[in-house]
Swiss-Prot record:
Pfam families: Transferase (PF02458)
Organism: Arabidopsis thaliana (Mouse-ear cress)
Single biological process term from Gene Ontology: very long-chain fatty acid biosynthetic process
Keywords: Acetylation, Cell wall biogenesis/degradation, Endoplasmic reticulum, Nucleus
Function statement: Involved in biosynthesis of the epicuticular wax. Plays a role in very-long-chain fatty acid (VLCFA) biosynthesis and is required for C28 fatty acid elongation in stem. Despite its classification as a BAHD acyltransferase based on sequence homology, CER2 does not seem to share the catalytic mechanism of the members of the BAHD family.
CC terms in the record's Gene Ontology section: endoplasmic reticulum; nucleus
Database matches in Gene3D superfamilies: Chloramphenicol acetyltransferase-like domain
Similarity section: Belongs to the plant acyltransferase family.
Annotated knockout phenotype: Bright green and glossy stems and siliques due to low abundance of cuticular wax. Increased levels of C26 and C28 alcohols and disappearance of C29 alkane and C30 alcohol in the stem wax.
Domain of life, per lineage: Eukaryota
Protein's name in the database: Protein ECERIFERUM 2
Residues bearing the modification N-acetylmethionine: M1
Length: 421
């Protein structure tokens, strides 16, 4: 799909119902800064036959003030602070909780019903057209951290699209925000999110050495977007339950009881080793999450896995993933703190990066008892080595979403198809 089918785009701002931020600063942690150039994007599709109308959702969206009471930092704006009174050091960004609000976008798609849209093979169109294309900057002091887009389709269906600056929190944090939105739209008191005050490293965190899970680059200034050397593409693989059962039977044994996520990681890793060669894909990054209800980036667990042997199969790669992960949270924190804001860093795509979304219920957004028919998450602002998101298992399939250079993507589709036949 070349041209945008979206019409009648209208933007407005929504601010908290009362003063909650009090202009207080919210400091960004090193883990926030490791995610500074990344954005979480999501779409929630609702087909036409529902107990609520698009007008109901739109009208309630303008009472988002109640939601922003709990998420006051989401309504803030980026500011720059002096670095420990060191005039030679760069300024450090933080969030000024000044109740400036979020953006709400209303739009229409008149050519499609939701059902016809979801029948299209290319799922990259979800985030191209149904999520507002927002990044922070170049006017940082005026850039909203969150955009919500409500798109009405023909015959009553709708899509709610989210663009979420990753400095606010990970995919779990964004999903919790949307769940709370659903509670508000349904007339329920929203659950207040949990934001701890002091990050704590796990006992096995490594503080020694340089982190290889993130990449250091020159400062991007006030336009917070990673520049790619090649054109990036998106694709969704739908692994049926039969595919999953076949892969598990083929590559796991009683002595090697790998998880489905381990096998899917290994399958994609092996495919890209075949495509890119040994030297470019010997190291992968894995993003897990602590079992926690907190909404922030500090609960991310960033690990690396290194492959040393030249000829390695899927079972051997799965064994490395299951048993040889090396956590780097401590090293990441130390690197970013020592840099003192003079450079920028990125995580997704610094190496081939895998993100485990298994613990996230993407379908928690519920409006008047109705859950979405399809949910699609992705990461925007990904480095050239790509990112792979493994979605939670659904009734009929497990989705694996990838963002890769287009040249690799075409070959990856063929490799994966050959491996699951």
């Amino acid at each position: 799909m070349e041209g945008s089918p979206v019409t009648s785009v209208r933007l407005s701002s929504v601010v908290p119902a009362s003063v909650v931020g009090e202009n207080k600063p919210r400091q960004l942690t090193p883990m926030d800064l490791a995610m500074k150039l990344h954005y979480v994007r999501a779409v929630y599709f609702f087909k036409g036959a529902r107990d609520f109308t698009v007008a109901d959702v739109k009208n309630t969206m303008f009472t988002l003030q109640s939601l922003l009471q709990s998420y006051h930092h989401v309504s803030g704006r980026i500011r720059m602070s002096d670095n420990d009174n060191d005039t030679s050091a760069a300024a450090i960004p933080y969030i000024r909780c000044n109740d400036s609000g979020i953006r709400v976008v209303e739009a229409n798609v008149e050519e499609f019903t939701v059902e016809k849209w979801l029948e299209l093979d290319d799922r990259s169109i979800d985030h191209r057209f149904l999520v507002y294309d927002h990044v922070l900057g170049p006017d940082l002091t005026f850039s909203p951290l969150v955009f919500l887009q409500i798109t009405q389709f023909k015959c009553g269906g709708l899509c709610i699209g989210l663009s979420w600056a990753h400095i606010l929190g990970d995919v779990f944090s964004a999903s919790t925000f949307m769940k709370t939105l659903g509670q508000l739209v349904s007339g329920h008191a929203p659950t207040k999110p949990v934001y701890p005050k002091t990050p704590e490293l796990t006992s096995h965190a490594r503080n020694d050495g340089e982190a290889i899970s993130i990449e250091k680059i020159d400062s991007v200034g006030e336009y917070w977007l990673l520049t790619n050397k090649c054109k990036m593409g998106r694709h969704i693989f739908n692994f049926s339950l039969n595919h999953i059962d076949s892969l598990m039977a083929k590559y796991t044994t009683r002595d090697q009881p790998f998880s489905e996520v381990d096998i899917l990681y290994a399958l994609i890793w092996k495919s890209l080793l075949n495509i890119r060669g040994e030297t470019n894909t010997n190291v992968i990054t894995i993003c897990d999450r602590k079992k926690s209800s907190t909404c922030w980036n500090e609960d991310l667990v960033i690990s690396v896995v290194e492959k040393n042997d030249e000829m390695v199969g899927i079972s051997e790669l799965a064994a490395l993933i299951a048993g040889e992960k090396r956590e780097e949270n401590g090293a990441i924190k130390r690197m970013i703190e020592q840099d003192k804001g003079s450079s920028d860093f990125f995580t997704y795509g610094a190496n081939l990066t895998f993100v485990n979304l298994d613990e996230i219920d993407m379908y928690e957004l519920e409006i008047n008892g109705g859950k979405p028919d399809f949910v699609n998450y992705t990461i925007h602002g990904v480095g050239d080595k790509g990112v792979v998101l493994v979605f939670p298992k659904q009734n009929f399939a497990r989705i694996v979403s990838v963002v890769m250079p287009e040249e690799d993507l075409a070959k990856l589709k063929e490799e994966v198809t050959n491996m699951i036949i």
